[in-house]
Amino acid sequence: MPRIALYPGSFDPVTNGHLDVVSRAVALCDRLIVAIGVHPGKKPLFSTQERLEMVETVFAPVAAAAHCAFDCTTYDNLTVTAAQRVGATIMIRGLRDGTDLDYEMQIAGMNETMAPDVHTVFIPAGVSVRPITATLVRQIAQMGGDVSAFVPPQVAHSLTTKFAG
């Protein structure tokens, strides 16, 4: 039975922190599905389509190099429901610090109650990417700062283009 993992997030934008988690997650599964959460009440910087393209461009080569099947999807319901919908038994969550752990443990507990067959796997972020958040990246880019140390080159280009107009 293939090990299918779901890695959910907003990916607005994709950061080197996300890339770090994906590079570790592909070693744990046969198929990785990155799921972009779409929330009607939120106004993301990048459209759903732009985020799908970013995720595919940045993560697919990493998965291919690890001989891990890769897919990208969107969801607008509970994350655990999205995991069940795609047949995932592993939910990948990246952790930067203790604050992330406290929050993610609560979510993992609730998810376990709703879907005991979906197991949360925490992947600690590498030291070099721990301070990176998509929110900070957006703020730096919006103010004209250089985000190249925090995001893949394709994403840096997309951010520069987005804020140039």
UniProtKB/Swiss-Prot annotation:
Names of the cofactor(s): Mg(2+)
Its EC number(s): 2.7.7.3
Subcellular location, principal: cytoplasm
Gene3D superfamilies in the record: HUPs
Transmembrane annotation, as ranges: none
EC class: transferase
Cytoplasm listed as a keyword: yes
Binding sites annotated in the UniProt record for ATP: S10, F11, H18, G94, L95, R96, E104, V129, R130, P131, I132, T133, A134, T135
Binding site for substrate: S10, K42, T79, R93
Function: Reversibly transfers an adenylyl group from ATP to 4'-phosphopantetheine, yielding dephospho-CoA (dPCoA) and pyrophosphate.
Family named by the database record: Belongs to the bacterial CoaD family.
HAMAP family: PPAT_bact
Assembly mode: Homohexamer.
Protein name (Swiss-Prot/TrEMBL): Phosphopantetheine adenylyltransferase
Species the sequence originates in: Rhodopseudomonas palustris (strain BisB18)
Organism lineage string: Bacteria, Pseudomonadati, Pseudomonadota, Alphaproteobacteria, Hyphomicrobiales
